[in-house]
Amino acid sequence: MSLLPAFPLPEVPSIPAEHLESTAALDVFKLAAAEFVHSVFPEVTVDKAFEGMESGKTGKQALGDFVVALARFRLKGKPQELAEKLAAEFKPTPYLAEIGASGAFVYFNLQTEALFRTVLDQINTQTHLTPDEDHSALSHFANLSLDDAGADKLPEGLSLAKKNGYGTNKSGKGKSVIVEFSSPNIAKPFHAGHLRSTIIGAFLANLYEANGWDVLRMNYLGDWGKQFGILAVGFERYGSEEELEKDAITHLYDVYVKINKDGETDESIHDRAREFFVKMEAGDEHAVGLWKKFRDLSIVKYKETYARLNIWFDVYSGESQVSQEAQKHALDQLQGSGIVEESQGALIVDLKKYKLEKTIVRKKDGTSVYITRDIAGAAERFDKYHFDKMVYVVASQQDLHLAQFFKVLDLMGYPWANTLQHVNFGMVQGMSTRKGTAVFLEQILDESKRVMHEVMQKNEEKYKAIEDPQYTSDKLGITAVKVQDMSGKRINNYEFKWERMTSFEGDTGPYLQYAHVRLSSVERKNAPAVVLPPPGERSAAINVALLSEPKAREVILLLASYPDVVKAAFKSFEPATICTYAFRLSHVISSAWETLIVKGQPHDLALARLWLYVSAKDVLGNALRLLTLQPLDRM
């Protein structure tokens, strides 16, 4: 019989609410340890003791599950003696098994059964919907998935749903954020910078949702400018309505390349292009109609590619959406703010005292520039959405521009200027197909699919067992591209390597999918001899006290840490934080297969181990979904 008292322990008002929302299983144990520290040293408040609890090291260097450095509390007396006093006064509790002193540090070991039951119950409760729960009440991020397991327990026609909520929290409840990312230029290549912005931005949008924020995903297209005049002239000469309908992005690029080549020897092309763009800006019906057709059909194609990447947008905005009136208003405000000065006929803002150089806000010919449109666009967005934060996911090459943009908004007196944030990243070097040619993202995705398909075919027996090789190879290829991009710090440049990223060995995307597939197979391979009870009955039916091996404890502590990993990633905006966790969990599970065997074991032990593996699959799946990946169950 479990000694665990009613979950959770009594709330302590001074602890931030997000610690007590059942999103981090270890928090209740930290709270128990913090209350004990406070009981011995009343001058240390419970919330300070709580914040001082750090996860202990695993493996040979392990001292305990939690470690706290008493020196941080600035207590009177020698830290080593204080640590010994704390250890001497300890008596086991339903949550805490033992504590010990090591120099100025105190370490806590948790009650094994309480640890396993709390963590597994929480993963189970926050992952699986029971038949009694409201299936319509899922958050957007929950990423509802259907599972045939246990379908016979539900009303006819309804599959058991999964809410995949473990690791999420409500710290951002009531707040809204706009994440602007991807932002390709119509009729120009979807290059490596756009790829990184797309991958990292989609992850950040998911990360905000996982932390309780309402998220608006915005794609700010490069959809205005003289290049549309060139396109119009080119389309008149080389265009095909049929090709445009089939694949607007590729066809417009082909037209753009051809007409630009013609323009090298025929200056009249550029004159006609300028005339067309003037008509666009004047609102000419024919010019705007043709531009709109180019834009709309390009967005249709973009949506197909984004859907393939498991990425979507709530709003397709763009340079064209920032009205002339808004730009004029922004310029008037700039001039009225007293920060603008004239320089050789142009208007500038001198930001040298902020170490940001000078920035032009209007050219000497009177035309607007990017920063003016950005100012007008940001103001329009705030008026429309009243966001609490807006994040621009843009390459580090634009660091100066974004810093100038934010500073000018601040100097103009916009109170929301300090809610804008630039999340930057380094460049991809050598992104191309294996033949050395690539212009569009879709070409890279098609090539990665081909490569993974070739790798899969090398194992003929396994290949025959794959239900849909084309689907599987596509998802594996996309995973390979994304994980290669996200596994290092985002500010670092990286080299695009086919052989490395498509390998099933080492820290690669295919390896993560393989780990998930293997975890997904455990239930299938052990049925019907060992079958988990329905989610609502697991806690009462499974004896977790049988999970006594050190390897099982290593797995459960890693699963328990996932909510804290999500919070850490939110502080740094580093997808590598989640990637590293997913790799670590996959490695630990890989080393557990020979120790924590399910097949052929006594039924109760097999059931407990099966629940542990299924929980690991649920957590790894959540990490992959957070990274915008689609976990595979078979390959």
Feature locations, PLM:
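Short, charged, solvent-exposed linker or helix-capping segments at domain edges/interfaces
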Residues: R117-I123
